[in-house]
Swiss-Prot record:
Protein name (record): NADH-ubiquinone oxidoreductase chain 1
PANTHER family: NADH DEHYDROGENASE SUBUNIT 1, NADH-UBIQUINONE OXIDOREDUCTASE CHAIN 1
Upper classification of the organism: Eukaryota, Amoebozoa, Evosea, Eumycetozoa, Dictyostelia
Chemical reaction(s) catalysed: a ubiquinone + NADH + 5 H(+)(in) = a ubiquinol + NAD(+) + 4 H(+)(out)
Species, as recorded: Dictyostelium citrinum
Stated role: Core subunit of the mitochondrial membrane respiratory chain NADH dehydrogenase (Complex I) that is believed to belong to the minimal assembly required for catalysis. Complex I functions in the transfer of electrons from NADH to the respiratory chain. The immediate electron acceptor for the enzyme is believed to be ubiquinone.
EC id: 7.1.1.2
GO cellular component terms attached to this protein's record: mitochondrial inner membrane
GN (gene name): nad1
Amino acid sequence: MKKEINMENLLYIIIEGGLKSLIVIIGLLIGVAFATLLERKVMAAMQKRRGPNVVGFVGLLQPLADGLKLVLKETIIPIVADKIIYAIAPILTFTISIVLWSVIAVGVQSVFASINSGVIFILAISSIGVYGIILAGWASNSKYAFLGGLRSAAQMVSYEVALGLIILSIITYAGTVNIQEIMENQEKVWFIVPLLPGFLLAFISALAETNRPPFDLPEAEAELVSGYNVEYSSTGFALFFLGEYANIILMSVLLSVFFLGGIVSNKISGAMKGVGMLCSFIWVRATLPRYRYDQLMYLGWKSLLPFALLIYIGVISMVLIIK
């Protein structure tokens, strides 16, 4: 009897986990479709043109058409590529982007479960994301892909340090590593008010972490053709694309959670904050030119890191004085 109950519980856990995973994947696909359409429409408006307007009403079905086009294309694997690692790399990148969403609060509870150390979980899992890109660059056996992978690894590691210090400052100020409790602590005053310099540093680091302009060095077309995914087509390229935009949406949501209160007021205002942060990413892409690689490294290690350390020390001092 005990064995049957355990088997029933196991089956329930598997079914529940599968359904929740499906919800996250479908939500991400819809979110990425919305983000790509929003990006193209906003950039078109900034450049005084119309943007996508052919497929569907005012171009609303354009992301669906692009997705179908990618999936229906032939998957071409280079002869000199390491085929197993070549296939694993985009799957790994997309899987990590899904796992990161498991602790993001979309209501009273998170998608999967309310983890007490949700912030630490995000920091730990996000640091693994670089492996998919490195594996893609190495397995493609192409100098452009390899250089793009190396650049991405160096860039993500460099800016993770500064971003980690800013998140530590938020944890210290809030006195918790639970995402839900961090939002609840901002009911009266958003953290952007006392931690405005930290917000600016976190935003710059988020741009670099997601390889967005002006820090899109791993995909620099003029230098590396397309970077680490230059040898990918069809589903492989689509998975990298989905993973990249899922991370952009995640960073937008995290910035709104850490500094703007997230969904502490209501879900609609929380969604508007996330969309506002996403529009900020798009605005930066449309206005700023790309950095040189040496300037990127200089900014990360000699400017952002010392400032992030000063902010962290300042937050610790402020908390000690208040207490």
